[in-house]
């Protein structure tokens, strides 16, 4: 045996003397368990919990963290401060037995008080740091999550209690939380296996308040998951939703006493934007379409403020009375409930439409989707909200439709019988004052000018309808030579030409070589159609005079194929009006008489309507009234009688 082997054996024998034995390991574990039991005894937890060593260590760590974070805050509310207040100063340190008895009594009172407070709370309390480390969880958490306080504290972080999809939303809320304000957020929390069979997550409304770097939150289920016994107040209504009775607690939420509400209609308290939604739910209940209904509405308080309220309404079997459980909610909860109710409406409509025929399913899906989208159209209240939106939606159409029906485009004179007017054909023995047709600044010409080689579509011409009154076209001014408007086979004078859309443009944009062509020569009812050349800006004379060549007959393009004007009836050469001196004098006299009569009526109209902006170029004519007209008629009758007498 070598020396090396003997040395190794000596080392091994020496190490066996210092190696831990089975008894030493057990003694060490017992010592650790004893320390853990001592720590567990200091925890404010009932011995009935029978915590494991691992649970005890995790809760101990949480308790130490809470004591460190709330140092100086908890000293004012500890049991020892209560003991010091209860025990007299002279015996507080002398009689240790008395101090212990008072301590036990205070602990018992605190436990009873804490139990009463937890029972009165609408949820459970969670305290955690801004980075999510848990500091405190109330014992009534098992009523909402199915998990005990000890199980919740094993996670060590508040974010471990949340659903993964809501973690970032809660983090952003905590980052934006002001030190002195409150934040509301709806998030989903993980539940026990038994509750998970009913729903994967439990949506809770978390009301967070930040104080001294500690977030204290009150977590309670959303209003749609609360039982009826936990409603803020109950109301009973008749079939027309008049209040028959109300809980006394309505005074704390709306400011009205129960006696003030009895006999009033429920709709008087609702926001105008929520009336339709509430009426639809009300009608569905009365029609026995559903056993109960959920409503998300805004209610006006006595101080004229608006609050969100979730109402669960149900009718009796006879449908003669309706009971409502009302829950006051925050705006954050209202947004969540609005989304949930909208999604449930969409899902129910899609399931009902799936059983219908394929042709009807597409129509019902679109209509149901639209109804689900507009079911909860309740934006945040503004003072400008009124019932005008409901008024328009009841059958009067949208606001744009009312505006379109009230204001046409383009505007037309008030006496126009139709937006599109037709040319007027004068008899051969009458003439129209040309000065009424072509004023220097406001003449009416076709808005759509066509190229010279384009044929006119018959649909572009105005249908034969109400003729335009010539007096509406322009004010009296700038008379033209009446001989320039006379045609060889009779005076054919157009009143106005309208484009297809009825738009009228000033005469300054009319090309100087545009002329009027008769549609069918020789026909007494032939209408005039415009034949326009390329648009050229021309300057109209200030006196309104139009050169003779501008009113000449312009030949139509050959081969145009117009159905309105046969080729054989179209002029082929430039022809001017040719009348002898006697004819021109007679026509001029007749035109002057007509012009004088028109000016008299214009003056009478201007006296009645002071808003007229046109003034006459001629000297003011005497105003014609009914007396003057009667005297003229009597004079004509007397002249006619004298003529017969002479005969």
Curated annotation (Swiss-Prot):
Domain of life: Eukaryota
Boundaries of every bHLH domain copy: 16-67
Keywords: Activator, Differentiation, DNA-binding, Nucleus, Repeat, Transcription, Transcription regulation
Span of domain PAS: 117-181, 238-274
InterPro entries attached to this UniProt entry: bHLH_dom, bHLH_NPAS4, HLH_DNA-bd_sf, PAS, PAS-like_dom_sf
PROSITE patterns the UniProt entry points to: BHLH, PAS
Gene Ontology cellular-component annotations: nucleus
Tagged with keyword Transcription: yes
Organs and tissues of expression: Specifically expressed in endothelial and hematopoietic precursor cells.
Keyword Chloroplast appears in the UniProt entry: no
Cross-referenced Pfam families: bHLH_NPAS4 (PF23183), PAS_11 (PF14598)
Region (Basic motif): 16-29
Observed effect of gene inactivation: Loss of most endothelial and haematopoietic cells and a significant increase in cardiomyocyte numbers. Embryos show defects in the endothelial and hematopoietic lineages at a very early embryonic stage, characterized by the absence of the endocardium. Early cardiac morphogenesis proceeds normally even in the absence of the endocardium. The myocardial cells form a tube that is demarcated into chambers, beats rhythmically, but exhibits a reduced contractility. Mutant embryos survive for one week of development.
SUPFAM superfamilies, sorted: HLH, helix-loop-helix DNA-binding domain, PYP-like sensor domain (PAS domain)
PANTHER family found in the cross-reference section: HYPOXIA-INDUCIBLE FACTOR 1 ALPHA, NPAS4 PROTEIN
Reported function: Transcription factor specifically expressed in endothelial and hematopoietic precursor cells that acts as a key regulator of the endothelial differentiation cascade. Acts as an early-response transcription factor that regulates the expression of early regulators of endothelial and haematopoietic differentiation, such as etv2 and tal1.
Name of the protein: Neuronal PAS domain-containing protein 4-like
């Amino acid at each position: 045996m070598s020396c090396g082997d003997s040395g190794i054996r000596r080392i091994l024998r020496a190490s066996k003397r210092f190696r831990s034995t089975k008894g030493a390991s057990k003694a060490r574990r017992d010592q650790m368990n004893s320390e853990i039991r001592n720590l567990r005894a200091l925890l404010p937890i009932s011995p009935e919990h029978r915590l494991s060593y691992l649970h005890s260590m995790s809760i101990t760590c949480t308790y130490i963290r809470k004591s460190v974070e709330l140092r100086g805050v908890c000293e004012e509310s500890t049991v020892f401060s209560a003991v010091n207040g209860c025990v007299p100063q002279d015996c507080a340190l002398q009689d240790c037995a008395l101090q212990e008895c008072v301590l036990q009594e205070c602990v018992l009172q605190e436990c009873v008080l804490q139990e009463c407070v937890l029972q009165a709370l609408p949820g459970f309390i969670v305290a955690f740091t801004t980075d999510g480390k848990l500091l405190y969880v109330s014992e009534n958490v098992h009523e909402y999550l199915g998990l005990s306080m000890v199980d919740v504290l094993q996670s060590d972080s508040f974010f471990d209690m949340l659903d993964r999809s809501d973690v970032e939303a809660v983090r952003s809320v905590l980052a934006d939380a002001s030190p002195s304000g409150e934040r509301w957020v709806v998030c989903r929390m993980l539940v026990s296996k038994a509750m998970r069979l009913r729903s994967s997550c439990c949506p809770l409304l978390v009301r967070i308040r930040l104080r001294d770097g500690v977030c204290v939150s009150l977590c309670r289920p959303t209003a749609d998951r609360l039982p009826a016994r936990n409603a803020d107040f109950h109301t009973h209504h008749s079939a027309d939703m008049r209040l028959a009775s109300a809980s006394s607690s309505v005074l704390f939420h709306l400011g009205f006493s129960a006696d003030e509400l009895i006999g009033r209609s429920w709709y008087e308290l609702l926001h105008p934007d929520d009336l339709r939604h509430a009426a639809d739910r009300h009608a569905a209940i009365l029609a026995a379409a559903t056993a109960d209904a959920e409503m998300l509405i805004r209610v006006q308080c006595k101080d004229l403020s608006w609050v969100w309220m979730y109402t669960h309404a149900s009718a009796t079997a006879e449908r003669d009375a309706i009971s409502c459980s009302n829950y006051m909610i925050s705006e954050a909860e209202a947004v969540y409930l609005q989304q949930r109710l909208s999604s449930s409406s969409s899902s129910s409509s899609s399931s009902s439409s799936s059983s219908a025929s394929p042709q009807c399913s597409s129509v019902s899906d679109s209509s149901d989707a639209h109804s689900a989208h507009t079911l909860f159209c309740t934006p945040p209240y503004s003072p400008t909200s009124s019932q005008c939106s409901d008024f328009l939606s009841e059958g009067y159409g949208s606001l744009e439709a009312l505006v379109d029906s009230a204001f046409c485009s383009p505007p037309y004179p008030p006496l126009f019988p139709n937006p599109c007017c037709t040319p007027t054909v004068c008899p051969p023995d009458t003439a129209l004052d040309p000065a009424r047709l072509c004023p220097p600044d406001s003449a009416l010409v076709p808005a759509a000018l066509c190229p010279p080689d384009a044929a006119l579509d018959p649909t572009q011409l105005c249908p034969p309808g109400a003729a335009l009154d010539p007096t509406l076209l322009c004010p009296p001014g700038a008379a033209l030579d009446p001989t320039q408007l006379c045609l060889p086979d009779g005076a054919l004078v157009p009143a106005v030409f309208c484009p297809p859309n009825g738009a009228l443009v000033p005469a300054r944009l009319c090309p100087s070589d545009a002329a009027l062509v008769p549609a069918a020569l020789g026909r007494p009812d032939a209408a005039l159609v415009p034949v326009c050349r390329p648009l050229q800006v021309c300057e109209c004379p200030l006196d309104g005079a139009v050169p003779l060549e501008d009113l000449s007959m312009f030949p139509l393009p050959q081969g145009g194929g117009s159905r309105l004007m046969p080729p054989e009836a179209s002029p082929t050469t430039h022809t001017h009006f040719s009348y002898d001196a006697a004819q021109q004098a007679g026509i001029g006299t007749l035109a002057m008489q007509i012009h004088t009569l028109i000016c008299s009526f214009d003056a009478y109209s201007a006296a009645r309507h002071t808003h007229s902006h046109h003034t006459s170029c001629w000297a003011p004519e005497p105003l014609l009234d009914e007396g003057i007209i009667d005297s003229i008629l009597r004079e004509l009758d007397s002249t006619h009688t004298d003529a017969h007498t002479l005969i």
